[in-house]
């Protein structure tokens, strides 16, 4: 068996009907669209409901896009801790946008970065984790900090460079 000798069985592949090729073809003249009218001339517009007010116009307008919305890349202290444990952040490092981009921790570089402290109900920092963070003497140079993040960073002896 060779590729150039293969062929379809009879009736396996049906050719499409060629329209507009004369009355004898079975789909000539009006090409199966019938005589006159909107659907014979062109397609009906998307959303057109036959003269009835379309659904999109019947529904009320809702919401808007705020011009003053702040887009943040959210970084949690747990993420920083994981990077420290993986030896990607060394002693005395300045954690800023460039470092986080280099480590591929940010989705978009245009957004501001906000540091959050671990949520006490779900992500609890152990005493080992806290001692590890204090030994490293990290410095944070980010755009925003949650209130608890700023408070705990200063409490643990790390530095907040800006703000």
Swiss-Prot record:
GO terms for biological process: translation. Keywords: Ribonucleoprotein, Ribosomal protein, RNA-binding, rRNA-binding. Transmembrane segments: none annotated. GO terms for cellular component: cytosolic large ribosomal subunit. One of its GO terms (molecular function) is rRNA binding. InterPro entries: Ribosomal_uL15 (IPR030878), Ribosomal_uL15/eL18_sf (IPR036227), Ribosomal_uL15_bac-type (IPR005749). Part of the 50S ribosomal subunit. Binds to the 23S rRNA. Belongs to the universal ribosomal protein uL15 family. This is Large ribosomal subunit protein uL15.
């Amino acid at each position: 068996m060779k590729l150039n000798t293969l062929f379809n069985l009879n009736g396996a592949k049906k050719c499409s009907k060629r329209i507009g090729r004369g009355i004898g073809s079975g789909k000539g003249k009006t090409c199966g669209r019938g005589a006159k009218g909107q659907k014979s001339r062109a397609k009906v517009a998307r959303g057109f409901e036959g003269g009835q007010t379309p659904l999109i116009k019947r529904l009320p307008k809702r919401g808007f896009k705020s011009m003053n919305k702040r887009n943040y890349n959210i970084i949690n202290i747990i993420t920083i801790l994981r990077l420290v444990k993986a030896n990607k952040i060394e002693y005395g490092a300045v954690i800023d946008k460039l470092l986080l981009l280099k480590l591929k921790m940010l989705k978009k570089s245009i957004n501001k970065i906000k540091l959050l402290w671990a949520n006490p109900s779900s992500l609890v920092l152990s005493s080992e984790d806290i001692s590890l963070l204090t030994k490293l003497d990290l410095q944070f140079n980010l755009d925003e900090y949650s209130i608890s993040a700023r408070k705990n960073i200063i409490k643990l002896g790390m530095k907040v460079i800006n703000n």
